[in-house]
């Protein structure tokens, strides 16, 4: 399964909202469709969002019918702004937008700028693929033979447009014949763990158990879990990390049980412009994601719902960051 593919100036994405029941690929024909796919989680995971954003901007730029920079620039800025507004938390999205904006700011010929934007999007895609492969290799070195590793949400190939970050670490350790196994949390409310991580672990042949989010502490107390590895959507300068809601709870539980808690993320997820997690904008999503399940209401009508998509794990709870440049241990 390929999450994202750029083919003949068309963006092909796998609709992740339908998995694992249906494997359906969508051909996106304009940047509005790309923006909508990001908003609705048809494409998701911080690195994949960044890649899709870059292609979406390239898409939009190719559709601008002018050869004059004075006419091209304001239309391009509208496209860039729409893509940037899709989701507020993932750093990779804004990294991609900034890189594409820089290409435009550096150009003087509209045709050449369009070509350069496509080239930059492809470059971002290849960089994320390569980064996830290196992350997986470095991270596998931390996993001891026979360990059971817990992961949360989905940080595999579907989320990274490549090999995977947190899930890539687990898969790489398995491929090294270390005899490891995994626990995957279902990840309410959108069940990325049950729908996506379970699918990827199954396809990779990794022995695993799917559990509800609230079971993690029980299995840690029983001594079943040896490490926790998660991905990230944005990492502040001090190491505070935003990731899927429920990550912070797992980090607290891991600390209480003496279990190392690792964050696997590419350098594109690190945001040096913000000092701490207090500065990270947390996306609030629709209440229907909690009150409905697969189109069926599961909660009473007319109730208040809180639905933050992410939480922030303080840096002091994280044993190490696994990046494409190596391992960064706490305090380094």
Curated annotation (Swiss-Prot):
E.C. numbers: 5.3.1.23
Enzyme class: isomerase
Keyword list, A-Z: Amino-acid biosynthesis, Isomerase, Methionine biosynthesis
Protein origin, superkingdom: Bacteria
Residues the UniProt record annotates as site (Transition state stabilizer): 153
Coiled coil: none
UniProt pathway annotation: Amino-acid biosynthesis; L-methionine biosynthesis via salvage pathway; L-methionine from S-methyl-5-thio-alpha-D-ribose 1-phosphate: step 1/6
Location of the active site: 233
Any one GO molecular-function label of the UniProt entry: S-methyl-5-thioribose-1-phosphate isomerase activity
Membrane-spanning ranges: none
Catalyzed chemical reaction(s): 5-(methylsulfanyl)-alpha-D-ribose 1-phosphate = 5-(methylsulfanyl)-D-ribulose 1-phosphate
Pfam family, one: IF-2B
Binding site for substrate: 44-46, 87, 192, 243-244
Any single biological process term in GO: L-methionine salvage from methylthioadenosine
InterPro entries: IF-2B-related (IPR000649), IF-M1Pi (IPR005251), IF_2B-like_C (IPR042529), Initiation_fac_2B_a/b/d (IPR011559), M1Pi_N (IPR027363), NagB/RpiA_transferase-like (IPR037171)
Family classification: Belongs to the eIF-2B alpha/beta/delta subunits family. MtnA subfamily.
NCBIfam families cross-referenced by the UniProt entry: eIF-2B_rel, PRK05720.1, salvage_mtnA
Known function: Catalyzes the interconversion of methylthioribose-1-phosphate (MTR-1-P) into methylthioribulose-1-phosphate (MTRu-1-P).
Protein name as it appears in the record: Methylthioribose-1-phosphate isomerase
Origin species: Dehalococcoides mccartyi (strain ATCC BAA-2100 / JCM 16839 / KCTC 5957 / BAV1)
Gene: mtnA
